[in-house]
UniProtKB/Swiss-Prot annotation:
Subcellular location: Cytoplasm
Gene: rlmE
Listed name of the protein: Ribosomal RNA large subunit methyltransferase E
Catalyzed reactions per annotation: uridine(2552) in 23S rRNA + S-adenosyl-L-methionine = 2'-O-methyluridine(2552) in 23S rRNA + S-adenosyl-L-homocysteine + H(+)
EC number: 2.1.1.166
Species of provenance: Myxococcus xanthus (strain DK1622)
Function, in words: Specifically methylates the uridine in position 2552 of 23S rRNA at the 2'-O position of the ribose in the fully assembled 50S ribosomal subunit.
CDD domains: AdoMet_MTases
Length: 213
């Protein structure tokens, strides 16, 4: 996961209920429970699907997504920090920066085809300045949406973590333009002090065919 937990004026307690539960169940991060809730609530990820996980370190989302797609599917996880390798051959990880100029080309080297879901848990390193953190969060989410628009197959799904702020509605409308249905979800595993929510886009609209001259 990119960045660090936002400071909302309350002590940061990493060893909470979900932290302990993740440890007991062999999950790499408490965030695994967030994506588990999302894919159970919405029909986004199925056996055989190809899924892109952005901001994937340390791998909690990847563990849940790997179980969801199974060995006939594929999960690609990227982050700016290394992710401990997975034993399943259908889970691939890479150290990449989504904001780098060569990101799209490097992602295509990993997988040239379309994705059934683009899921982003990316978050910026927070500054403590609310407006700045919101803008940085939307920049990352916006890049994820660009990828979903360019690489998501018709009917595919999209998930992005964002910090709610002034431009939240504008970004939600951008998702609505691409997907038939958009949901705003705050998973139960989200820390009480966090300002994050997840925007979920369901059923990617088929791109319109260019008009004939």
């Amino acid at each position: 996961m990119l960045g660090s937990p936002p400071d909302m004026g309350k002590p940061y307690r990493p060893k909470d209920h979900y932290f302990q539960k993740a440890k007991q169940e062999g999950l790499r991060a408490r965030s695994a429970f967030k994506v588990d809730e999302l894919i159970k609530r919405f029909p986004m990820v199925k056996k055989g699907h190809v899924v892109l996980d952005l901001g994937a370190a340390p791998g909690g989302f990847l563990q849940i997504l790997a179980d969801a797609v199974g060995p006939k599917g594929r999960v690609i996880g990227v982050d700016i920090v290394a992710i401990r390798p997975f034993s399943q051959p259908f889970v691939q990880t890479a150290v990449l920066d989504v904001l780098a100029d060569d990101f799209d080309a490097k992602l295509t080297e990993l997988h040239a085809g379309p994705f059934d879901a683009v899921i982003s848990d990316m978050a910026p390193k927070t500054s403590g300045i609310k407006a700045t953190d919101e803008a940085r969060s939307l920049r990352l989410a916006g890049k994820a949406l660009e990828l979903a628009a360019a690489r998501g197959r018709p009917g595919s799904s999209f998930v992005a973590k964002v910090f709610m702020g002034r431009d939240f509605e504008d970004f939600r409308n951008q998702i609505r333009a691409l997907f038939e249905e958009v949901k705003v979800v705050r998973p139960e595993a989200t820390r009480g002090a966090s300002m994050e929510v997840y925007l979920v886009g369901l059923r990617r609209r088929a791109p319109e065919a260019p008009e004939a001259n």
